[in-house]
């Protein structure tokens, strides 16, 4: 559920 944070952290 926390994996969706990759798009803004890339």
UniProtKB/Swiss-Prot annotation:
GO CC annotation terms, alphabetical: extracellular region
Domain of life of the native organism: Eukaryota
Main location group: secreted
Keywords: Cell wall, Secreted
Localization annotation: Secreted, Cell wall
Protein name per its UniProtKB record: 96 kDa cell wall protein
Record organism: Arabidopsis thaliana
